[in-house]
Each structure stands twice: as structure tokens, then as C-alpha cells.
């Protein structure tokens, strides 16, 4: 909208230079002021929009912190780029989505309304290949045991 505002004063200057067209200038002035008033409304709404943006500001849940912690446990001297971190975050989201979907299907097949650790475990065995599934199941079992004991 700023480029339009710059164009309008440029149009007014030639009209001001011609004294013969003062009446037409006076007639055009209110017409030009009305769009300006219209422009002020979106600016005010924009200011209100900023408040709404502040209110709508939600924290985006990512696994970046946890990926970094695991990386430092495995390789303390190695870093990770932000692009690689984004890829890892997308990868984890994708795997969790697949596990949730498979768990949901298993619960529906067995006509059960809840997804239990058993459905999750079976979904892990179905989604992840071979040795990776075995390690995931053992780590998951260990985590559930630790959670229930504390």
C-alpha cells in the first residue's frame, strides 16, 4: 500500500501547479481522502492483527533438544547443522506418525477403544525393520518399567 500512497502525492503536485484546475482539485481531494481513510482502517486492523499474532503465538513442539542430547551422549565432540536437525525432526515426526497409525489400526482390528503399550509394541515390530525393532522394544520396555516404578 505504501507505493500507492507515494503515487498519489505525485498526482497531487501536477494538479497544484495548474491553478485553473483548483475546482477539480477540490472535488478530487475528498475522493482521495476517502481511500486514505480506507487505508487507515487496515493499518489499525493491522495493529490489532499484531495483538492477535501475539495472542496466537504458540510454541512449536520439536525434538531438537532431545536429538542434540542423544548426539552428545553418542558423540560429544560432533555438532549438527540446523538443516540436518530439521531433517532429523521431520524423520522422528514421520516415524511417530506411522507408529500411531499402526497402533490405531491394531486397536480397531481387536475392537478395543484404547491403545495400550501392547499395541505400541506390536506397531514398533511391524513398522521398524529387524534388529532396530528389537532394540526399540527393549528400550521402550525399559522406559515403561522405569515410569511405572517411580
From Swiss-Prot:
Comp. bias regions, Basic and acidic residues: 1-35
Subcellular location field: Nucleus; Chromosome
Modified sites of kind N-methylalanine: 2
Entry comment on modification after translation: Can be acetylated to form H2BK6ac, H2BK11ac, H2BK22ac, H2BK27ac H2BK33ac and H2BK34ac.
Organism for this UniProt entry: Arabidopsis thaliana
Modified-residue entries (N6-acetyllysine), positions: 7, 12, 28, 33, 39-40
Modified residues (N6,N6-dimethyllysine): 13
Record's GO cellular component terms: chloroplast stroma; chloroplast thylakoid; cytosol; nucleolus; nucleosome
Gene: H2B
Covalent cross-link Glycyl lysine isopeptide (Lys-Gly) (interchain with G-Cter in ubiquitin) as placed by the record, residue numbers: 146
GO terms, molecular function: DNA binding; protein heterodimerization activity; structural constituent of chromatin
Similarity-based family: Belongs to the histone H2B family.
Protein name as annotated: Histone H2B.6
